Design a protein with these regions (language model features):
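N-terminal cap/lid segment of alpha/beta-hydrolase-fold proteins
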Residues: 3-29
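Conserved HGGG/HGGXW glycine-rich cap/lid loop of the alpha/beta-hydrolase fold
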Residues: 23-76
């Protein structure tokens, strides 16, 4: 378990890892008895970004379930290498935590797993909110060489991208934009 940290004034996370039927997941669940709002973060984020995305959720009325999607922070990429596997991982996380249903709030690259979760597990979803989400399908081009495939489809590649973003954000952003 990572140390609790305050992300914004009044918003803290206490991330921990749970083993699900689909693999390990880093998550944070706020206290309370209310309905659950599950947050699927975008690219370059994790459990921390997910929690900040849910800052507007009434903490007295709802519980916020934030997670790191596969390949981000404490969740290994092997826990969900496809959109469908990530959707099933969301269901497995609910199972492991003993939760029946959740509203899903997604942002950016967190959209496709959220959409797939709602399609594959409709009985587990009581609401779906998409904030500036990716809504198309982006597949690895057939022309992508082994280095590009290794960077975008392995834990080591994801760690290297993260390190590049930390060490040289100027180069990282130049490649994206």
């Amino acid at each position: 378990m990572r140390q609790p940290s305050e992300l914004l004034p009044g918003i803290s996370i206490h991330p921990q890892t749970i083993t699900t039927a689909q693999g390990p997941v880093e998550y944070d669940l706020t206290e309370g008895d209310g309905p659950v709002v599950l947050v699927s973060h975008g690219g370059l984020g994790g459990v921390d970004q997910a929690r900040v995305l849910a800052a507007w959720v009434d903490a007295q009325a709802f519980r916020v379930l934030s997670l790191s999607r596969p390949g981000y922070l404490g969740t290994p990429l092997a826990s969900g290498q496809t959109i469908e596997a990530q959707a099933d991982l969301l269901a497995a996380l609910l199972d492991a935590l003993g939760l029946e249903r959740a509203a899903v709030v997604s942002a950016s690259a967190g959209g496709p797993p959220a959409y797939s979760f709602a399609i594959r597990h409709p009985e587990r979803v009581w609401g779906l909110v998409a904030i500036d989400c990716v809504s198309g399908y982006y597949d690895m081009p057939e022309t992508a060489g082994p280095i590009a495939q290794a960077i975008f489809t392995t834990d080591l590649g994801q760690k290297l991208l993260k390190k590049l973003g930390e060490m040289r954000p100027d180069l990282f952003l130049k490649q994206i934009f």
